[in-house]
Amino acid sequence: MRRTLWVPVVVSTLGTLVFQGQSAHAATTPAAALATRPATTPPAITPPAAARLTKPKPKSTVKPTTVVALTFDDGDRSHAMAARLLERYGLRGTFYVNSGDLGKKGKLTRAQLAAIAKAGHEIGGHTVNHERLTDLGPDEQAATICSDRRALLGMGYRVRTFAYPYGAVDASARQAARDCGYNAARTIGGIATKPCGGCVVAEPARPERVYEIRTPGSVHDDTSLAEMKRYVIRAEQNGGGLLPLAFHMVCAKGCGSYSVRTKVLDQFLGWLATRERRGTAVRTIADVTGGKVRPVPAESVTP
């Protein structure tokens, strides 16, 4: 009789321990890994909120008054990690890459760029090798802008918007961006970074100069979390509109003037994700400007 009673108790105790162990494991297992488990072994508890937000947030039926566009220039290798940070909060960004630099030291590989696009981020053009367009003649401008877009389209990306390297733009560069099939182009600067009377604090919801969309300069290593928050709050308090932010490298300890610390970016994204209830949403530049994927002109052949 003792053996008969002892066995169920041991089995019950072991079952409890196994269940507790599975629960602890489920609490630390990434959402992607949980998704691959058989349906017969669901996780015992819900993963943390940050792990759950791996898909873009569904667009609200209420039109936001303020739209923040998070843009990342130059195809730096740190952008693979930056994209994952955005995904943690259900946000998506625009990544402007130089097609001729992919795979080079310090730059994204083609596989990394494909993963960024697959996660729902926008891929945009940035010239073949980051040429300063105002140093080129109109034909050279058109050649690098069109060749870059042609290459990215050939990789399978829906390339609809462009960013001028260094923010350097003139009339012929704007025309080249249009002629090469882009629906919009972003520059650097033009939006106030400090409070001032009558200053521009955001683009209109539909930018008036769609081939010269402005930003509050570039985010630098000395741009504080509080300052980035103020950019957004000033836009909210002044009627809203489109606020594009331009980032470059993302580094844990800083890696030059044109960089943002990983911790600061993470904190900013976490804060930004809470602004939806205030009428502020995060969208890609292509989401805002719209338009179909237009063809790029055929490459000219020199006789």
Residue ranges and their predicted role:
Residues H79, T109, Q141, I145, ...:
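Aromatic/hydrophobic pocket-lining residues that form the small-molecule binding cavity
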Residues L70-G75:
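DG-centered beta-turn motif at the end of beta-strands
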Residues T65-V68, E87-G217, G241, A246-A252, ...:
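Metal-dependent polysaccharide deacetylase catalytic core of the NodB/CE4 family, i.e.
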Residues D76-R77, N129:
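Short, glycine/acidic-enriched loop or turn micro-motifs at the edges of active sites
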Residues M1-A31, A35-T36, T40-T41:
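Secretory targeting and sorting signals
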